[in-house]
């Protein structure tokens, strides 16, 4: 159930957490109250500045413990898009001069990635890099056998998202990491050009466990607004600081990100992460997901859950459900739901409103199915009543459509 900043319940249902998680205003207001008393530049060399700096470093260490990595390899940035660009900027700077001298280098990815990855790779392609797209299965997951075939001595980076932002389906990042590590140790032994492994973890962070060491990752990127934090804030993890800063200036964040960090956003993110872990928010979301699927089965709606048939519970995010509505087009569904105070989306919200239907569903199935598929994003703030309301509304739309045939 949607609430305002004061905690008052609004007669609206927000089911679009994959676009952005509703802000945790309770925590945000608590942190604002604390910072009002000690507001200062965390890089200032006085007591107030050092106090803020201490709070920021506490969050850095907290996140490092959560994802099992060296805290000195975590850098605060404006979010996933900036973090992704920083990874590719490093690769460009490391290899572009060698490409100019006639060498050839590959970057392996999939066509299911977020637009900030795909667009960046197109730019690298223009600069002479070979962009190799690995095959995907019927769920949109990376085909492990095809990945093995495409690794070569020319490969410098593999970039695969942890979970798809439009379907919630997860890639086997641990397995991919093991394959890359094996290749590095056997085929590239002694070479300075080891294959680096990057994963866009924007949808997964705070929902599923990420273990950097176990997954053998060199980079991950995270956006705090996807878990209830503030916009324009997140992290990049870069093993051994394998980065080149995009912004130059005061050498903040160990010289990797110049500019004064957003203390409010960082401290809020730390508190929200604590809340997620301590209150086991994921278990609540799982119950809501099960309830959604039960209510769909009990309803008169003709539907299918995209990319979900046969998957185990640990192979997809409970927070994201892509649903194919056989008799309802996405435009009608979203318009009528919106008019009834129920908010969902069709696909990614990261393309400035240019695309209504899911391009991922179109790639996996076809355009017609994509035009009849909605994305429901569940958050810890949702209720069983929210699920009842959207099912009730979709049933009414279904009845109108079938009765008019």
Name each region found by the language model.
Residues 1-405:
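Pyridoxal 5′-phosphate
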